[in-house]
Amino acid sequence: GEQDEGNVWEAAMLAGKYKLSNVIAITDRNNIQIDGPTESVMPLEDLKEKWEAFGWHVIEINGNDIEAVIDACGMAKAIAEKPIMIIAHTIPGKGVDFMESDFHWHGMPPDHEQAKKALHELRTLGGKIRGEHE
């Protein structure tokens, strides 16, 4: 929902105009905002084309993949002629069954029991991820 705001696009235009090559930004493109799915509230697609139109180099990644995030940051540092936007396509609440992709959790904290359950699920997921990368 942040990119519904004019100040985001004013900054995008300025950075593109002046070719601020020391700017690397990351958009968490999770497709939700506090009021619901972003495309229902205020459609943004094609987001990549919008940033490119303002003179930015755009890298799109799976933002739930930490290695992809690290790789994209490395690639971004190697680009010297313009600002960089990394669009990280994410699933909000990834790994927590009762939170995953549910916009209601975007602005609501879990209660104590929900937090315990979420942390347990994330710890279990973390062990699986570590095992895949060892």
Sequence positions of predicted segments:
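Glycine-rich ThDP/TPP pyrophosphate-binding loop and its adjacent helix/strand module
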Residues: 1-134
